[in-house]
């Protein structure tokens, strides 16, 4: 998906609902 989740997952996980990690950023599923 598009990187619209506004957080990084380079050092952890995504916390925004409906988002997944596409290193190093979170992307909308």
From Swiss-Prot:
Q: Which PROSITE patterns match?
A: CYCLOTIDE (PS51052)
Report the superkingdom from the record: Eukaryota
Q: Which Pfam families match?
A: Cyclotide
InterPro entries the record matches? Cyclotide, Cyclotide_sf
Alphabetized, the UniProt keywords read:
Disulfide bond, Knottin, Plant defense
PTM comment text: This is a cyclic peptide.
Where exactly is the Cyclopeptide (Gly-Asn) cross-link placed along the chain?
1-29
The Gene Ontology biological process terms listed for this entry are:
defense response
Where are the disulfide bridges?
A: 5-19, 9-21, 14-26
Q: What does this protein do?
A: Probably participates in a plant defense mechanism.
- Which family is it part of? Belongs to the cyclotide family. Moebius subfamily.
Q: What's in the domain note?
A: The presence of a 'disulfide through disulfide knot' structurally defines this protein as a knottin.
Which named protein is this? Cyclotide vibi-C
Gene source species: Viola biflora (Yellow wood violet)
Q: What is the lineage of its organism?
A: Eukaryota, Viridiplantae, Streptophyta, Embryophyta, Tracheophyta
